Amino acid sequence: MAKHLFTSESVSEGHPDKIADQISDAVLDAILEQDPKARVACETYVKTGMVMVGGEVTTSAWVDIEEITRETVREIGYVHSDMGFDANSCAVLNTIGKQSPDINQGVDKADPKEQGAGDQGIMFGYATNETEILMPAPITYSHRLVQKQAEVRKSGKLDFLRPDAKSQVTFQYDQGKIVGIDAVVLSTQHCDSVTTPDLREAVMEEIIKPVLPSEWITKDTNFFINPTGRFVIGGPMGDCGLTGRKIIVDTYGGAARHGGGAFSGKDPSKVDRSAAYAARYVAKNIVAAGMADRCEIQLSYAIGVADPTSIMVETFGTEKVSHDIIIEAVRQFFDLRPYGLQEILNLLQPIYKQTAAYGHFGREEFPWEATDKAELLRDFAGIK
């Protein structure tokens, strides 16, 4: 592809689907804090005045689902009834049951190293050297815009903003390299008192300009700030929210393939989550080692079976060493069994609530973002 455009979108922590994701992961974290070996599959539904938390959990822990839910909604910023959703007064329904013993017998083994996958499925991981965090630029800057929206809202700098927001950034590429930004969309919920011109000016000056690199902005860049002109009704009052509905926002913004499995609310025995994190870890280390400019990893699993049923490595013609060397390096240096994923990436810890908004990848605080295998891979491949 010579010249082309590519677009990704993100949503804020106050988007209904992201409220649901954060509640599911807050419940997961609270359980893992007491019982790291718990089996958790937690789903959340939110709508005006109501949160329903359901799923399957097997654990020795006890957690206060209602209080976790209210505190999560409170932290996001829905604390007044005039927003259509209030952490202090919304109904919280709990319909959590136990995990099926039929699933359990396939996962739990006498030898922990032979722990089986919690389900069948396919997972993808991706990395590219087009940004310093080895992530695609469109999703990276889409996340940063809505993160900035939350920052200026919570600090009171733009006190007329409300929690719900969406962003979208279109990048221009030439021969695979970024040459500019073609379009920026940012829609943010707001209180009724602010005028559209004032809001648009404030968003441009306090959110967009501080986030997007000026060298990529030209006179031809299009900006669409609250293009409908009004966004007062938002959050769960505007749309219902469900866990697991923002899987492309959570990953690579469409720049890589997706196996279809969502992440939030799932403990690390669920390979939908842990293997997707591991695939990112592998792809990122391959790119960090200089073995390729872009790398996509596919993994697949069978329920109750420890070893992956397949491993695929795609480098899109950007590899700097033989494809066979890359595949051998993956097999030799990465333990991709469920137990191996949990141990290498230290996944049995309560770190998941913070993943549930602004993307699971490209954030250095998470263990799957480490490039600690890069030097080993360079030596193996003979890269100087």
Swiss-Prot record:
Its EC number is 2.5.1.6. Keywords: ATP-binding, Cytoplasm, Magnesium, Metal-binding, Nucleotide-binding, One-carbon metabolism, Potassium, Transferase. InterPro entries: ADOMET_SYNTHASE_CS, S-AdoMet_synt_C, S-AdoMet_synt_central, S-AdoMet_synt_N, S-AdoMet_synthetase, S-AdoMet_synthetase_sfam. Binds 2 divalent ions per subunit. Binds 1 potassium ion per subunit. Pathway: Amino-acid biosynthesis; S-adenosyl-L-methionine biosynthesis; S-adenosyl-L-methionine from L-methionine: step 1/1. It is found in: Cytoplasm. Signal peptide: none annotated. ATP binds at residues 15, 164-166, 230-231, 239, 245-246, 262, 266. Residues 99-109 are annotated as: Flexible loop. It comes from the Bacteria. L-methionine binds at residues 56, 99, 239, 270. One of its GO terms (molecular function) is magnesium ion binding. K(+) binds at residue 43. GO terms for cellular component: cytoplasm. The keyword Cytoplasm applies. It catalyses: L-methionine + ATP + H2O = S-adenosyl-L-methionine + phosphate + diphosphate. PROSITE patterns: ADOMET_SYNTHASE_1, ADOMET_SYNTHASE_2. CDD domains: S-AdoMet_synt. Mg(2+) binds at residue 17. Its main location: cytoplasm. Its cofactor is Mg(2+); K(+). Homotetramer; dimer of dimers. Catalyzes the formation of S-adenosylmethionine (AdoMet) from methionine and ATP. The overall synthetic reaction is composed of two sequential steps, AdoMet formation and the subsequent tripolyphosphate hydrolysis which occurs prior to release of AdoMet from the enzyme. Belongs to the AdoMet synthase family. PANTHER family: S-ADENOSYLMETHIONINE SYNTHETASE. This is S-adenosylmethionine synthase. It comes from Vibrio campbellii (strain ATCC BAA-1116). The gene is metK.
